[in-house]
From Swiss-Prot:
GO cellular component, one term: extracellular region
Keyword Cytoplasm: no
Recorded family membership: Belongs to the glucagon family.
Alphabetical list of PANTHER family matching this protein: GLUCAGON (PTHR11418), PRO-GLUCAGON (PTHR11418:SF0)
Main localisation: secreted
Lineage: superkingdom: Eukaryota
Location(s) in or outside the cell: Secreted
Protein name in UniProt: Pro-glucagon
GO molecular function terms attached to this record: hormone activity
Organism: Atractosteus spatula (Alligator gar)
Induction of its expression: Produced in the A cells of the islets of Langerhans in response to a drop in blood sugar concentration.
């Protein structure tokens, strides 16, 4: 149950973070006067790649912390 709760909370965090990143990107695009369609596709792809890389990194870190937490819990039971 705790793993499901952790996963659900983490998924919500990632969704919120992606939404914040997208809003920030929109705001910076508006401030800069917009971008061309070709540059928009390249920038959106780069932003998506960056977001994907960050998400993967955060998921890896969360998984490592969770495994460590599980191991510590097992040590206490023994």
């Amino acid at each position: 149950h705790s793993q499901g709760t952790f996963t659900n909370d983490y998924s919500k965090y990632l969704d919120t973070r992606r939404a914040q990143d997208f809003v920030q990107w929109l705001m910076s695009t508006k401030r800069s006067g917009g971008i061309t369609x070709x540059x928009x596709x390249x920038x959106x792809h780069a932003d998506g790649t960056y977001t994907s890389d960050v998400s993967s990194y955060l998921q890896d870190q969360a998984a490592k912390k969770f495994v460590t937490w599980l191991k510590q819990g097992q040590d206490r039971r023994e």
